[in-house]
Amino acid sequence: MYHPHHLPAHGQVQSHQHREDAAATSSRDVNGGLSVTESAIASFRSLREKYPPKKLTRDAMRRYLKDPNDQTLIVLHAKVAQKSYGNEKRFFCPPPCMYLLGNGWKRKQQILEEEEGSSEAGQLHAFIGIGSSEQEMQQLHLDGKNFCTAKTLYISDTDKRKHFMLNVKMFFGGGGADVGQFSSKRIKVISKPSKKKQSLKNADLCIASGTKVALFNRLRSQTVSTRYLHVEKGNFHASSIQWGCFAIHLLDDDESESEEFSVVDGYIHYGQTVKLVCSNTGMALPRLIIRKVDKQTAILDADDPVSQLHKCAFYLKDTERMYLCLSQERIIQFQATPCPKETNKEMINDGASWTIISTDKAEYTFCDGMGPTADPVTPVPNVHSLQLNGGGDVAMLEVNGECFTSNLKVWFGEIEADTMFRCAEGLLCVVPDISAFREGWKWVKESVQVPINLVRNDGVIYPTNLTFTFTPEPGPRQHCPAALNILHGSKRPSASMPPTPVSGSEDDSGRGNESDRGDPIMPIKRPALDVHGRPVAPEAAATMNGANMLRTAS
C-alpha cells in the first residue's frame, strides 16, 4: 500500500533521488494501492530525457500573459478536527475537499495523451492523508470532475499531535509526471465540542466576524443524513455532496436590510445580528440573528461567544419566529413555536438546527510555461508582499513570502529581472528599466503597470496576482550600477555614500522648474509600487540585510 512521502522543508530543493522515489509511486497494483518498482524509476528517468528543463523565453511569457493556462489546486477543509477514541472513527466533517480549476489541467492532459499515445498517460491520480505514517493515504476519485471529497479521514487518540496538516499527492498515470505534494493549512485537534459557556479566553475556538464558516445539518445524529449549506445555480440548497464556505459578518443591531451593509469587528456572540455571504458566488442570506440551540429549542437570551461545532439556529430578523431550515435538499423558512413553560425559548425542528465550524483553504497556482516538466511543481512559492527600495536607476524590489528556492527568478511582465535568493522567505531583484516595456517612454507621461510573476529555471510559472507600476516623472537621469553590483557579488558600496545630487527644483505638481536648472529637462523614472490599487512611495534609502547600502535623491 501507498504511504506518504514527507514534504520537504519550506524552500528546500528536493534531490533527484527523492524525485525518482516519488515518481515510482505512479505504478499501481490491482488493489488500487501503490508499489515502488524498478520500471517506474526507469520510466521517470526516461521522462527526464523526454522533458529536459527549458528556460522560459520572452515569447512564452508573452503568450502566457495573453492567455494564462493556469493550473489551480484548492484544498478546502475545516479549521478543527475532532479526535477519535479507541476503535471509533469520527470522520472529519465537513470532509476535506479538493478543487482543480483552470484550463491548464485539461491542456496538460491532452499534451501527455498525445505524446504518450495513451489515455492513461493523461489520467490524474490523487491521494490524501493526515501526514502520519500510522495511517495510509486515501485515494481521491476525480472521475472526470473538477472536485472530490475525502469522506473517511480521521485522527485517532494515539496520534498525540495538537495540530496537523493534510497532504495531497498528485501524479499523472502511465509512469507520467509527478505533479507534487501539497499541504493544507494547519488544523487544530479538539476532543469534543465544549458544552460549557464559552469565554474569549479560548479565542482560537471562537468565531470572528469576517471569517469563513461551514454549516451542516445532521438529522437524528445520523452521519448518512448530513447535508451542507451550499449555493448552486444561483440558489441556496442543502447538498449531501458539496459544502460551501460562507463569510459570517457581524452587523449593528440597527443595520437595515440592504445589498450593501456595514460590518463590525469582533467575535460572534449569540443574540447578535449576522450576515452570511457565499465566498464563491457573493450571494447573501437576509439579516439573521444567531441563537444557541439546546435540544430542540432556540434560546432567546443566550449571549456567550459562538464556538466550534456548536449547534445554532438562524432567526430571520423582523419576521414572525421564522428560522433558516432545510427540507431534504431545499432551504425553507420554518416558523418556531413559543415554549409554553420557558418564555426565553422557542421550539424548532431538527432541520433548523445547524452545526457551525470555521473553514480554511490552501490554494496553489502554477503553469508549465515551456510544456510538461519531469520535476514536481512543488514547493509552490507564495508571495505575501512587495517592498520597493530606492528609486531611479537603482530601484530594487524585495519579495516577501514563503517556499522560495534559489532557482526562482522575478519577472516584470515579459521581462526577467536580475534576482538574488536571500532565504526561503525573501528574494531581492533589480527593477528593470521602463524602456524595456514601452518604446519611446521618454515621451509618454502615463503610468505603465505590469504583473509580477515568479518563474522556475525549468519554465514553471507561479503567478502572484500582484502588479508593479512605473510612473515616469521629469528630472535628470541617474546612472549608478550599484544595484547590479550587489546582485553580481561586486564590491558593496559604502554605507555612507552621499545622495546623488539633483539640479533644479520641482513645483507642487511634481513638474521640474526649468528656470532653476542649468541643464535641459530630461525624464527620470521613479518606479512606484501599486499593489491592488494602493500606491506606495519609494523609500529614500535601500536597506538590505540591516545595512544602509545606498541612498538616492528623493
From Swiss-Prot:
SUPFAM superfamilies: DNA-binding protein LAG-1 (CSL) (SSF110217), E set domains (SSF81296), p53-like transcription factors (SSF49417). GO terms for biological process: Notch signaling pathway. InterPro entries: Beta-trefoil_DNA-bd_dom, BTD_sf, CLS_fam, Ig-like_fold, Ig_E-set, p53-like_TF_DNA-bd_sf, RBP-J/Cbf11/Cbf12_DNA-bd, RBP-J/Cbf11_DNA-bd_sf. Residues 1-31, 489-554 are annotated as: Disordered. Gene3D superfamilies: 2.80.10.50, Immunoglobulins, LAG1, DNA binding domain. Keywords: Activator, Developmental protein, DNA-binding, Notch signaling pathway, Nucleus, Repeat, Repressor, Transcription, Transcription regulation. Residues 508-519 have a biased composition (Basic and acidic residues). One of its GO terms (cellular component) is nucleus. It is found in: Nucleus. Residues 381-471 form the IPT/TIG domain. It holds the Pfam family LAG1-DNAbind. One of its GO terms (molecular function) is DNA-binding transcription factor activity, RNA polymerase II-specific. SMART domains: BTD, LAG1_DNAbind. Residues 83-90, 218-227, 291-323 bind DNA. Interacts with activated Notch proteins. Belongs to the Su(H) family. Transcriptional regulator that plays a central role in Notch signaling, a signaling pathway involved in cell-cell communication that regulates a broad spectrum of cell-fate determinations. Acts as a transcriptional repressor when it is not associated with Notch proteins. When associated with some Notch protein, it acts as a transcriptional activator that activates transcription of Notch target genes. Required for the transcriptional expression of Brachyury, suggesting that it participates in notochord differentiation. This is Suppressor of hairless homolog. The lineage of its organism: Eukaryota, Metazoa, Chordata, Tunicata, Ascidiacea. The gene is Su(H).
